[in-house]
UniProtKB/Swiss-Prot annotation:
Keywords: Cell membrane, Membrane, Transmembrane, Transmembrane helix. The keyword Transmembrane helix applies. It comes from Bacillus subtilis (strain 168). One of its GO terms (cellular component) is plasma membrane. This is Protein CsbA.
Length: 76
């Protein structure tokens, strides 16, 4: 359970960062990460709502981080 919680905190954040670097658009990256998370929920890899909540928090944090980076890049 602790391992899944740690992974739920880090992996969605890192996926948003990775997909943003690949697609050059943080909105697309958030959508791709959310789609992967939704597919894993449907497949049954999530046991508790606590893990789902951690996934959502990490996804939002990744989106906010990349939005901040995009704003910094526009200022340059």
């Amino acid at each position: 359970m602790i391992t899944k919680a740690v992974f739920a905190l880090f992996f969605p954040f890192m996926l948003v960062v990775l997909f943003t670097r690949v697609t050059f658009n943080h909105y697309v990256a958030i959508a791709l990460t959310a789609a992967l998370l939704f597919a894993s929920y449907l497949k049954g890899y999530t046991e508790t709502y606590f893990i789902v909540g951690l996934d959502v928090v990490s996804l939002v944090a990744g989106g906010l981080y990349m939005a901040k980076k995009a704003a910094e890049k526009k200022e340059e």
